[in-house]
């Protein structure tokens, strides 16, 4: 068994679609980034890559490459799964935490869990997604951006 941790942060930006955990959340500015800026899937991807000692998301999907411009992060997470499998690993568990003031995420969590499970070819019961606010503190509290933390366990195939 190996453990990984991933963290990602993105600022909000006008004119972008908000996508978290592969779920479109209407009525709110999106997150800014080279890809779709899915803060949750980026944190999960980094946790998995770290657990396998395979670097990070920036190494495999650099923000300098047009290939990944505005790409759906579910595609990236599926690529991470394939990379893990190539190196003899599979996902055992994902536990993730979103940090943002608005919008409220509770109605979307089941969809996020399903998307992560589908990308990683695991059961939904192996994926936990939670959300909390920053109690109005810092850039998250001022609603300037969002962050996600993820911890994973992987094992040899």
Curated annotation (Swiss-Prot):
Catalytic function, reaction form: 4-CDP-2-C-methyl-D-erythritol 2-phosphate = 2-C-methyl-D-erythritol 2,4-cyclic diphosphate + CMP
Species of origin: Pelodictyon phaeoclathratiforme (strain DSM 5477 / BU-1)
Family to which the UniProt record says this protein belongs: Belongs to the IspF family.
Biological or metabolic pathway of the protein: Isoprenoid biosynthesis; isopentenyl diphosphate biosynthesis via DXP pathway; isopentenyl diphosphate from 1-deoxy-D-xylulose 5-phosphate: step 4/6
Enzyme Commission identifier(s): 4.6.1.12
Entry note: cofactor: Binds 1 divalent metal cation per subunit.
One Pfam family cited in the UniProt record for this chain: YgbB
Function of the molecule: Involved in the biosynthesis of isopentenyl diphosphate (IPP) and dimethylallyl diphosphate (DMAPP), two major building blocks of isoprenoid compounds. Catalyzes the conversion of 4-diphosphocytidyl-2-C-methyl-D-erythritol 2-phosphate (CDP-ME2P) to 2-C-methyl-D-erythritol 2,4-cyclodiphosphate (ME-CPP) with a corresponding release of cytidine 5-monophosphate (CMP).
Full protein name: 2-C-methyl-D-erythritol 2,4-cyclodiphosphate synthase
GO MF annotation list: 2-C-methyl-D-erythritol 2,4-cyclodiphosphate synthase activity; metal ion binding
InterPro entries listed in its UniProt record: MECDP_synthase (IPR003526), MECDP_synthase_CS (IPR020555), MECDP_synthase_sf (IPR036571)
